[in-house]
Amino acid sequence: MEEFGKLEERVVLVGVQTDDHDNVEESLDELKELASTAGAVTVGRIIQNRESVHPGTYIGKGKIEEVRALVYAMDATGIICDDELSPAQLNNLERELDCKVMDRTLLILDIFAARAITSEGKIQVELAQLRYRSARLVGLRESLSRLGGGIGTRGPGEKKLETDRRLIRTRISALKQELSQVEKHRELIRSSRARGNMKTAAIVGYTNAGKSTLLNTLTGSEVLSEDKLFATLDPTTRLLNLKDGQQILLTDTVGFIHKLPHHLVEAFKSTLEEAKYADYIIHVVDSSNPQAEMQMHVVYETLKELGAMGKKIITLFNKQDAPGACVLRDFKSDYTLKVSAKTGEGLADLNDLLEKLLAEEQIYVERLFPYQEAGKIQLIREYGQLISEEYTEEGIAV
């Protein structure tokens, strides 16, 4: 995996507060954390209050002067805008500021590029990167060449920064075909699980909510779990053996985030749809985060976009061991539990709840198999749950 921080970038964050916009200060706090994840140091921030973003330059002319002065004073190498810039906005800001210009989408794509491990993840990232760049070739070519590296130049598709629109279209077409094969493979796996009557639960949540830690603690696996944004990019599925002998498959998914780029939603559709096809949703919330309520809203909006609502949802208010942990109201959830994936607090209650949910869906059957049909009992073990068996003179009673 490529390491962040080989080339330190000093950046100024720029945001626009509009009437219909969320709190931009909080959004810039998250942007700062994203920038840090990508190896950049935030040296300042500027916010403009406007009815709407400037269609040509994102911010007004007066604010551009302020940004230029701050970039110079702090010896910054570039700026990161809190929203996705249009091609015109990118080109105009690049020309006005004479420094590297990036936006939230480019930043998140860059982090994803360094986090991708599997071939599927790399294909999805490259596809998202190329779709984003195809409309911004001129501005990005100039901006990203300023430092010869850094944010925006990482990833499987960045061995050579493509600046030819025709080549990009050809590459996108090839990636779509590769991704189509991956999606077919995923469908086969899902069909196999369905035939085996194996229930699945998708673990979803805002990035860094503790999803991978939960999966590791429950199943004893060793999925990459770090206290950083997007530590997990590729979905991981593990078998959970419940205390009563029942089993369920748990899938750890990529974390959601505020203003998740449309390019990523499209490219990662096959991965994100693990939530759509799961039998249950386990929604992990970082209960110690002051923005927990906003993060819950983002998760549900993303699930709605994916068509993954309408099934039983278990909300886990995680990190109860952390200072400031709380429990919020979740009207979209069927069940809520207080847990700590780190210490194990509350996980016994989760086990009991999963046992209850699985038991409610089971059909109990009693049958006597003649000894010549004993082989069928093995099929019961494979595709169901054998509660008891008794050998009698007539055959095997199950």
Each model region followed by its residue ranges:
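Short alpha-helix plus adjacent loop in nuclease-associated cores
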Residues: L106-A128
